[in-house]
Each structure stands twice: as structure tokens, then as C-alpha cells.
Regions:
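Bacterial N-terminal signal peptides
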Residues: 2-12
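Divalent metal-coordination and catalytic microenvironments
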Residues: 26, 42, 47, 71, ...
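C-terminal helical cap
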Residues: 26, 308, 315-316, 320, ...
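Metal-associated gating/positioning segment near the N- to mid-region
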Residues: 72-129, 145-151, 177, 204-210, ...
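Divalent metal-dependent hydrolysis catalytic cores, especially in the metallo-beta-lactamase
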Residues: 97-116, 132-141, 161-175, 191-194, ...
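Active-site neighborhoods of metal-dependent hydrolases
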Residues: 156-167, 171-174, 220, 224-364, ...
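C-terminal cap of metal-dependent C-N hydrolases
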Residues: 394-440
Length: 446
């Protein structure tokens, strides 16, 4: 009872700490039907966007915090659709990681390797007790080891649904009959499944089963490969890199059509692949300020692993080119692309890797607005929550970024954060810098 009262008090305090905020005279990039509103005010009350109006046409409510938006740009918060949240050890690291996402303007994440702690973290964020992005979390991994037979897979689906996880995360190694049982049970339990594509399943079967999302473009290289390369004599390697020289590029349109028809979304994690496949230039990590949130030991381990990958994967360049072409054709065909970088993961740090993934979409050929949609409105649509977030529209939850330059002209401008609003909680640049310094200091002691 005492704990319940304490949590209730904390929740009330968190809610009370959200006075009205008026962003005055900004350019509002709504991500809502392409509307960009110059010289507009945006008012946030009670955690939601209360009003968007031409500057000078309405006054600020009494007690409002007024933020000068002159020469600045407002856009919806970004989403990271392939995030990893740690467990309870080391103490406090999971909370720091969530704050790290938020401090970079990531206001929604999809956690792809869940555990019970993450359900608790999700609740704490929703109650306003913890600074962090909106969290959608999978349950624990379903793979060839954890689900060796159909009965086990069916039980795991039911248990994870009952526990309150948002979706199921599949990893490699599932036998076809196990996958079929998982897919059927997930439909019956009304919980989506997504993630990897097991070799015994294949992309076409995953699409036919209506897998909600495929991460890493997993399985697509195998689907493109000539049959002679699939007898086991050619090692497939990381995400199919060893099959790149066997890939038949003319098969891409057929695969894209099947993907579009299935309604399956793509979470590419392209920056993860390109980081791995880049020339082994020494110091690739040292120049990045984001890596102050890592221990030197971790950086050394990542560098060693990357060198081994590059040396063992002469087809890496072709692999990257094929993946880029897949993404180009998928986007052109209208396959939903959801920004996911895989962070924190090898060479990917929260925030930095999301920005880099976004910029890669621009390099591949997406317009800035289409690229921004992969991290905003596309994500809300994927979760069936367009009435909650993903756009700047009156009535939606106030996840808002204040930028000093226009991301609709240059995607790199998403890095120019002057403040982040998390469901009505305003964090100006000075506050973000303090948060980041504190996280780095704690990480240095771990």
C-alpha cells in the first residue's frame, strides 16, 4: 500500500511538472499530408498539442513557458524501430540508455529483445516517472533453441501475450513447422510477430504468413541467390553476405511485389551493415563524440569484430549495393520502410546511429520528407496509432523536436537539436547537455 501511494504521488508530480508550453513563430513541419506551416505557433497543454495557429492570432495561456521559434523548425519526434534495451545489470544502465535515446530526439523506440524489466520500464515511462521514449517491446527471443517444437512455440506466444508484450521477436533457427505454429497462434492471440527470417522458412513463407515486419532485410539475399549457391557449399555469412555474388538482381522486382502485397514492413538497419562493410580505416570510432557513452573495452571489442568481418567477407561491397537497390525498389513500390538502425549494437550508438540511418535513406534516393516519414508517420501507422503520435496535429501527444535548421532541405539538420519535448515534458538544449554529461560520467565509472 505504501509503495502504491508513493507511485501515485510520483505520477502526480510528473504530471504537474508539465506547464503549458508555447513555441512561438516557428516553421512547423507537420508530417501531415506534406503541410509545412511558416510563422506559426504551437501550444502544448496537458501533454498534447492543443493548438497550431498563425503567429499573432492567439495568446499564450497564463503560466506558459514561451519558446522563441524564430528561424527554427518544429517536427515530430523520431522513432528508432530496432533498439536494444539492457537488463537490470549494471544497475541504472537501462534507464541511462532510455534517457540517451530521448536526449537525441528519439521519442519512440521498438525494443527488439525484451524481458520482464522492459515491461516495468514501459510502465514507468507512461507514468512520467522516467525520462525516456515511448516504448514498444517484444518478448524474449523465439528461436531454434528456445522453441525447438511447435508446442513450445505456441506456449511462448500465449505466455508473451498474457505478460503484456507488444509483439513477438523471432531470431534464426526456427523449423518451418514451428514457424507455422507460431504464426497461427499469433493470429489467434492477436499479437504480431516480426524480426528475422529463418533459413528453413524463407522470405516467401514469411510474407505469406503476414509477418508484420522483417528486420535487417533478413532472408532477401538468400531469396535472390542462384539455387546452386544454396546447397551449403557457400557459407551464407552475416545476413547473407556470402551469397551476394550469387544474387540474381533481376529477381528483385518479383520480391518487392510480393512484399508489397503482403503488407510487410521493412526495418532495414542499413547503417549496421554499412558500418561493418566499410574499409577498415583505423580510428573509425575515435572521432565520434557519441562513443563517450561506451567503455574503451567495448570499443576495442567492436573494432576487433569488425576487422574479422571485413577480412572474411570479400563480397561485402556487392552486398551493400544489392541491399541499397532492394530498398530503392521497395520504396518506389510503396513498401513501408521503418527507420531502424540496431542500437546500441556494433558501432551503433543511440541517436547517432538513427541520424546516420536517416541520412543513408537520403543517399539511397528517398526525398528528405519521405525519409523523415520512415521515423514518424510510418511508425505510427505501423502500430495503428496515428491518432496518438507521428505528426504535429492538434490533439496528438506532444512529441516535438526544435531544430535550428530545416531537415526538409538537408536530413543532417536533424542533428541540430535545440530541444526535445516528450509528451509535453520540455527539455531545452541546456538540460539535454547536462543529461548527456551525466550519462557519460556514469558510463566511465562502469
Amino acid at each position: 500500500m505504501r509503495l502504491f501511494l508513493l507511485l501515485s504521488v510520483l505520477s502526480c508530480v510528473a504530471q504537474a511538472a508539465k506547464p503549458p508550453v508555447l513555441f512561438r513563430n516557428a516553421t512547423v513541419i507537420t508530417m501531415d499530408g506534406g503541410k509545412v506551416l511558416a510563422k506559426h505557433d504551437l501550444l502544448v497543454q496537458d501533454g498534447r498539442i492543443a493548438r497550431i495557429s498563425p503567429t499573432g492570432t492567439a495568446s499564450a495561456p497564463e503560466g506558459s513557458t514561451v519558446v522563441d521559434g524564430t528561424g527554427r523548425f518544429l517536427m515530430p519526434g523520431l522513432a528508432e524501430m530496432h533498439a536494444h534495451i539492457p537488463g537490470p545489470e549494471p544497475a541504472g544502465y537501462a534507464e541511462d540508455l532510455l534517457a540517451l535515446f530521448a536526449a537525441h530526439g528519439i521519442t519512440t523506440i521498438r525494443g527488439t529483445l525484451g524481458q520482464p524489466l522492459h515491461l516495468e520500464l514501459r510502465s514507468r515511462i507512461e507514468r512520467g516517472e522516467l525520462i525516456g521514449p515511448r516504448l514498444f517491446t517484444s518478448g524474449p527471443s523465439i528461436n531454434g533453441n528456445t522453441a525447438p517444437d511447435a508446442a513450445t512455440a505456441e506456449r511462448m506466444v500465449r505466455e508473451q501475450k498474457a505478460a503484456g508484450y507488444d509483439f513477438l521477436k523471432m531470431h534464426p533457427g526456427l523449423e518451418r513447422k514451428v514457424f507455422d505454429a507460431l504464426a497461427a497462434t499469433s493470429r489467434a492471440e492477436r499479437i504480431p510477430f516480426s524480426g528475422h527470417v529463418s533459413t528453413a522458412v524463407g522470405v516467401q513463407a514469411a510474407l505469406a504468413a503476414k509477418q508484420s515486419a522483417i528486420d535487417h532485410l533478413d532472408g532477401y539475399m538468400r531469396a535472390l541467390a542462384e539455387e546452386r549457391c544454396l546447397d551449403g557449399s557457400e557459407p551464407a555469412g552475416f545476413m547473407g553476405v556470402g551469397l551476394a555474388d550469387c544474387a540474381v538482381e533481376s529477381r528483385i522486382p518479383e520480391l518487392v511485389t510480393a512484399t508489397k502485397k503482403a503488407g510487410t514492413s521493412m526495418v532495414p538497419t542499413q547503417i549496421l551493415i554499412e558500418q561493418w562493410a566499410a574499409p577498415p580505416t583505423d580510428g573509425i570510432l575515435r572521432s565520434r563524440a557519441a562513443y563517450r557513452f561506451l567503455s574503451p573495452t567495448t570499443i576495442a571489442q567492436w573494432r576487433k569484430a569488425r576487422m574479422q568481418f571485413v577480412q572474411a567477407s570479400p563480397q561485402a561491397k556487392r552486398f551493400v549495393e544489392l541491399r541499397r537497390e532492394l530498398l530503392r525498389q521497395m520504396h518506389a513500390a510503396g513498401v513501408p520502410i521503418l527507420l531502424g538502425s540496431d542500437a546500441p549494437q556494433l558501432f551503433n550508438m543511440p541517436g547517432e546511429s538513427t541520424f546516420a540511418e536517416l541520412e543513408l535513406y537520403g543517399a539511397i534516393g528517398l526525398s528528405p520528407m519521405d525519409a523523415l516519414a520512415t521515423a514518424t508517420v510510418n511508425v505510427a501507422r505501423f502500430f495503428g496509432q496515428e491518432d496518438r503520435f507521428g505528426r504535429l496535429r492538434e490533439g496528438l501527444e506532444a512529441d516535438v523536436l526544435l531544430l535550428s535548421a530545416d531537415p526538409g532541405i538537408n536530413l543532417a539538420n536533424v542533428r541540430k537539436l535545440e530541444g526535445v519535448m516528450l509528451r509535453g515534458r520540455w527539455l531545452p538544449r541546456a538540460r539535454l547537455d547536462v543529461m548527456l554529461d551525466e550519462i557519460a560520467a556514469r558510463q566511465a565509472r562502469r
